[in-house]
């Protein structure tokens, strides 16, 4: 990437962080789901899959992820200082060192333990709703029948694979790396992980 392009990215990202989060996740996480469909069904798209609806939903979810990353990356170091670790807030934004690694791990574990299960369940609900609407854009304006979808979710897969396996064995280390990166590229890296998420969702789908 040229210095000019990276400079534009940094300035636009700093001024319009939520817009960039919408675009990053809307594009990259949707591509990840298309890759997941390719793994599970042999095609990148099919009738009823709802690529555009998924892109919009992922964009909105991406803004929520950006918010969560800000809240936890600021709040966890503050709590660590409250518990006695000096300068945790400065260390997480400084050069890479062992202390920064531990803080990044703490941020990742806290965020993925508290936020990720709710996020993953809500994503599954929206995904089911899009499929129930035949992939149509009307899924974006049709009320989600929350009680019905939650009742019929495959909680065995959600708990035993999505929560118990992907969170500790993939998302804890993946987001530890994320929080070691400079602030302006964390959300971009998290969006790139959406490709990996698509693969994981494909594996979960095969476990039904």
Give short role names for the model-derived ranges.
Residues 1-208:
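Juxtamembrane/disordered regions of integral membrane proteins
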């Amino acid at each position: 990437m040229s210095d000019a392009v990276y400079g534009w990215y940094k300035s636009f990202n700093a001024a319009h962080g939520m817009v960039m989060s919408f675009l990053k996740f809307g594009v990259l996480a949707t591509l990840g789901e298309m890759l997941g469909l390719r793994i599970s069904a042999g095609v990148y798209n099919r009738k009823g899959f709802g690529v555009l609806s998924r892109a919009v939903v992922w964009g909105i979810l991406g803004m929520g992820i950006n918010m969560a990353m800000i809240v936890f990356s600021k709040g966890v170091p503050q709590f660590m200082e409250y518990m006695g670790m000096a300068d945790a807030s400065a260390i997480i934004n400084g050069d890479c060192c062992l202390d920064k690694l531990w803080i990044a791990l703490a941020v990742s574990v806290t965020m993925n333990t508290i936020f990720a299960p709710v996020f993953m369940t809500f994503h599954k609900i929206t995904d089911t709703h899009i499929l129930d609407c035949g992939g149509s854009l009307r899924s974006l304006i049709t009320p989600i029948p929350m009680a019905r979808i939650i009742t019929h979710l495959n909680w065995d897969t959600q708990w035993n694979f999505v929560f118990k396996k992907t969170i500790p064995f993939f998302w804890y280390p993946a987001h530890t790396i994320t929080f070691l990166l400079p602030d302006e590229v964390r959300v971009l890296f998290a969006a790139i992980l959406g490709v990996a998420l698509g693969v994981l969702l494909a594996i979960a789908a095969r476990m039904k």
